[in-house]
Amino acid sequence: MEDAILRRTWAEIDLDALEHNYKVARTRIGDGVKYLGVVKADAYGHGAIQVSRKLEQLGADYLAVASLDEARELRHGGITMPILILGHTPPEMVPQLISYHITQAVSAMAKAEEYSAEAQKCGGTLRVHIKVDTGMSRLGFLVRGEHFESGVNAIAAACALPGLDAEGIFTHFAVSDMDGAEYEAYTREQFGVCTDRKSVV
């Protein structure tokens, strides 16, 4: 009986609400800032292709997904706008990344070198975004405190590798969705770390 009930449930997604939210966010970030919509995990259960089509129609600049499979699904669904893979992609998949016009996040020099080697091997150029660790302590080039100089140098070296086109830099805020002055101050500090390193590189 429980299975029958579960099969009859669904989520109804209001694309007008998505449009409203997009416009509010766009107003807050301003015209000079690019908008990237994260649609990983089937747009968090909202339907990745439908949400992506709406964001593309509204003028979003970029989409982000977790994996190559998710990126390919969007391409097969007719999505043509730039897509960034936030998660790891095995280096041997670089030819697919290039042929599908997918951008890959790079979180360490070793990964940048692997992607560079594979891109050169297939005679292409892989677009990448550099991930900076500003406090999440999950993935990314270390640039805080004593790691500043070595981190910035590593990012600059990764950006200069043949076969790679470093078109962006990003971070993952550790506590951006938590309330309170302490958390807000920490998020602002993380943002400052990322933008300071970007200006140096």
Locate each region found by the language model:
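Short, compositionally biased segments
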Residues: 196-198
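Active-site-proximal beta-alpha core segment in soluble small-molecule metabolic enzymes
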Residues: 5, 9-12, 17-20, 33-192, ...
